[in-house]
C-alpha cells in the first residue's frame, strides 16, 4: 500500500513540475542589461594576474528614493550611492548613481538580480575616470 502512495506522490510531483513556467527568455533579456565582460572574472569576483588580481566595479542608476535604495541595498551589499553624480552611465536629475563591486559572494547572482529590476536600464563597468 505504501508503494502505491509513493508512486502516486511521485507522479503528482512530476505533473506539477511539468506545469511550472520558468521565464528564461525574460531572464535572458534582463541579463542583456549587463554590459560587463565577466569571462575573465574568477569565482571570487577578481580578474588579472595571480599577483595582482582586482575586483571589477560596475555602475548603474536608479530613481533617487529611499525605497529604491533599500531594494538595491538588499540585493547588493557592496553598493555605494552617489546622488548628484552622473557617472559614465549618465544618471539624470531624479536618479542616483550606484557603484558596486564583483568582490562579493555570488556576484553573478547579484548582477542578475539587479538586472531583473525594471528601473535599472543598464549596468556597465566603472572606470573611475
Annotate each PLM feature.
Residues 113-124:
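Short acidic amphipathic segments
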Residues 15-18:
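C-terminal motif of bacterial Sec signal peptides marking the signal peptidase cleavage site
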Residues 65, 102-108:
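Helix N-cap motif at beta-to-alpha junctions
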Residues 86-101:
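Surface-exposed aromatic
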Residues 20-78:
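N-terminal secretory signal peptides
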Residues 53-55, 91-94, 117-118:
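Extracytoplasmic
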Residues 1-8:
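Bacterial N-terminal signal peptides that target proteins for export
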Amino acid at each position: 500500500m505504501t508503494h502505491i502512495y509513493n508512486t502516486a506522490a511521485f507522479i503528482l510531483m512530476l505533473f506539477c513540475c511539468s506545469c511550472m513556467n520558468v521565464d528564461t527568455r525574460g531572464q535572458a533579456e534582463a541579463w542583456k542589461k549587463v554590459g560587463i565582460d565577466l569571462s575573465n572574472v574568477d569565482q571570487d569576483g577578481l580578474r588579472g594576474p595571480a599577483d595582482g588580481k582586482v575586483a571589477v566595479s560596475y555602475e548603474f542608476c536608479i530613481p533617487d528614493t529611499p525605497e529604491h535604495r533599500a531594494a538595491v541595498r538588499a540585493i547588493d551589499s557592496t553598493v555605494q550611492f552617489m546622488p548628484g553624480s552622473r557617472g559614465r552611465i549618465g544618471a539624470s536629475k531624479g536618479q542616483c548613481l550606484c557603484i558596486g563591486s564583483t568582490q562579493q559572494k555570488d556576484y553573478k547572482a547579484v548582477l542578475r538580480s539587479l538586472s531583473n529590476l525594471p528601473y535599472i536600464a543598464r549596468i556597465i563597468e566603472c572606470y573611475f575616470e
